[in-house]
């Protein structure tokens, strides 16, 4: 994306930017703007979430941001302070990178709105990251939290209910010898209610290619890739909501 922007400015708007630096200097200056993109993403996300009533349906999940995959995942060393190697079960492959954890608000007949987003190393468990998210940035609304089985934890469920007024709903864990069909139907219903977050991840990836980061060469470059794209996504939704 940065290369395309740079080439477009150089080819079509150079008279407006006669002192356009080299591409390397251009990238360094963009990397210095990471805190600004972080702040803009938070501001625009807050503006989108302000429209909701006091009680909402949250959905929580994560998606991988991949710097290297398969055979190259074991030897990758870029941004080691943020990245590591893990296995992605949905893609059935090992990758080196980070996870983007997302707490979104479900909307009828529309893409959900992200209230909280957090980066972690790829190997961090989703439940561990979720606890950190709620501790560092308490949710702005009460209501329900739709999650998958990775978030099942009775102690955390009690904390959500007593401290945040949120009841977590997950697919039922099948017990040994349990053949109740109603349990399967319940789990299917929960999964269907969670489907919008998959649509959210697919949308942000198709529009902004956030999950593809093989071109990243530094920690600041990774942060720029993530937060500049998140800010762009929030701004896009703000003008199209």
Model-flagged regions — what are they?
Residues 1-241:
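Short alpha-helical elements
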């Amino acid at each position: 994306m940065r290369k395309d922007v740079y080439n477009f400015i150089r080819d079509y708007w150079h008279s407006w930017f006669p002192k356009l630096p080299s591409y390397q200097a251009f990238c360094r200056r963009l990397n210095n703007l990471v805190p600004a993109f972080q702040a803009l993403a938070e501001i625009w996300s807050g503006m989108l979430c302000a429209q909701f009533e006091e009680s909402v349906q949250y959905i929580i999940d994560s998606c991988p941001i991949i710097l290297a995959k398969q055979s190259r995942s074991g030897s990758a060393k870029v941004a080691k302070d943020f990245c590591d190697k893990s296995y992605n079960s949905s893609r059935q492959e090992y990758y080196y990178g980070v996870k983007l954890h997302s707490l979104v608000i479900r909307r009828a007949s529309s893409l959900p709105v992200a209230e909280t987003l957090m980066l972690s190393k790829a190997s961090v468990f989703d439940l561990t990251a979720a606890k950190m998210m709620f501790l560092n940035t308490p949710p702005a609304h009460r209501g329900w939290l739709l999650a998958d089985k990775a978030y099942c934890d009775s102690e955390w469920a009690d904390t959500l209910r007593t401290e945040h007024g949120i009841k977590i709903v997950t697919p039922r864990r099948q017990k040994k010898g349990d053949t109740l069909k109603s349990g399967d139907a319940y789990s299917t219903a929960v999964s269907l209610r969670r489907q919008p977050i998959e649509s959210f991840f697919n949308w942000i990836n198709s529009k902004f290619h956030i999950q593809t980061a093989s071109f990243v060469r530094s920690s600041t470059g990774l942060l720029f890739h993530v937060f500049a794209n998140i800010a762009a996504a929030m701004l896009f939704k703000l003008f199209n909501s």
